């Protein structure tokens, strides 16, 4: 991961985020250019400037945590004590809990878009001012998407720390439980990301970019505003090309239900590991 041209949008991003880290809410000093960083969320374009809709403000500590996930494949196993491993797993579980909440909120917002935009169209037909409603909806969507994706990236980084633990210092039962916890947490991350991707399809079905929420032009596969490639909607269309929103919403709900089930399993397995660490 490199900073590339993220600097181009720093001022706008910091102003939008009230000069505070969107993960831990640490406030930066306006006079200190190193107090805050910009971090890209989602599948940003590989070349050119990253649009501010896909940039989140983070503090240096959170930026370093996020960097761990990208550096993890090259990292050496980390030796930790039973107490340190317990705290690490507990913190990872806490962070994932926050990610679940953020993803659920984003999914709820996304599934409300057809109704919201339909109401805007009705208001416009009646001669009422609808531009402010669209702007507010767009801002809420972008914020919700960034929050969900950032939370998932932070959870991924925490999970990489768990995976990087050198298990040879622990007995076989702890090693087995640790592996099971990491595997279950990874499954949870995949399910949550699936829910986000399916939620991102909703605005595309409404001819809006899933990143910046600006209108998509014609049959273009790439947004002319932020450069993101549009999500594929073919699987969510009926025989005559109409959008099958109910089926799409049902799939989003299925992903969230799956995440809930996996969370229950993860909680049980984490408690087992915690008990073993306490006894060791």
Region annotations inferred by a language model:
Residues 1-3, 13-27, 149-203, 253-260:
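A broadly conserved sequence feature marking short terminus-proximal activation segments
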Residues 2-10, 20-70, 207-214, 226-231:
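Histidine-centered nuclease catalytic patch
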Residues 96-99, 103-120, 205, 214, ...:
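Peripheral, non-cofactor segments flanking catalytic/redox cores
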Residues 113, 117-120, 124, 192, ...:
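Leucine-rich amphipathic alpha-helices with coiled-coil/heptad-repeat character
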Residues 196-240:
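Cys/His-rich short segments
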Residues 225-280:
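Charge-dense, extended regions
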């Amino acid at each position: 991961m490199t900073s590339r041209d993220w600097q181009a949008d720093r001022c706008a991003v910091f102003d939008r985020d009230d000069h505070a880290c969107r993960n831990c809410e640490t406030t930066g000093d306006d006079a200190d250019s190193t107090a805050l960083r910009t971090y890209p969320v989602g599948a940003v374009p590989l070349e050119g400037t990253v649009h501010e809709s896909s940039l989140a403000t983070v503090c240096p500590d959170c930026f370093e945590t996020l960097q761990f996930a990208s550096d993890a494949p090259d990292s050496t196993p980390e030796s930790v004590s039973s107490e340190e491993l317990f705290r690490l797993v507990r913190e990872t579980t806490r962070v994932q809990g926050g990610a679940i909440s953020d993803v659920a909120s984003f999914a709820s917002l996304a599934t409300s878009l057809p109704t919201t935009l339909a109401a805007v169209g009705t208001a416009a037909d009646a001669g009422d001012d609808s531009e402010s409603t669209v702007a507010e909806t767009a801002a809420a969507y972008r914020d919700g998407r960034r929050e969900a994706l950032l939370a998932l990236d932070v959870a991924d980084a925490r999970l990489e720390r768990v995976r990087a633990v050198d298990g040879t210092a622990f007995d076989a039962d702890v090693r087995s439980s640790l592996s099971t916890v990491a595997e279950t947490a990874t499954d949870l991350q995949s399910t949550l990301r699936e829910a986000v991707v399916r939620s991102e399809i909703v605005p595309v079905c409404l001819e809006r970019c899933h990143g910046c929420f600006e209108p998509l032009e014609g049959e273009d596969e790439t947004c002319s505003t932020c450069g993101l490639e549009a999500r594929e909607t073919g699987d969510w269309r009926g025989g005559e090309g109409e959008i099958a929103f109910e089926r799409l919403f049902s799939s989003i709900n299925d992903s969230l239900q799956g995440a809930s089930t996996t969370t229950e399993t993860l909680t049980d397995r984490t408690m087992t590991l915690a008990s073993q660490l306490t006894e060791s």
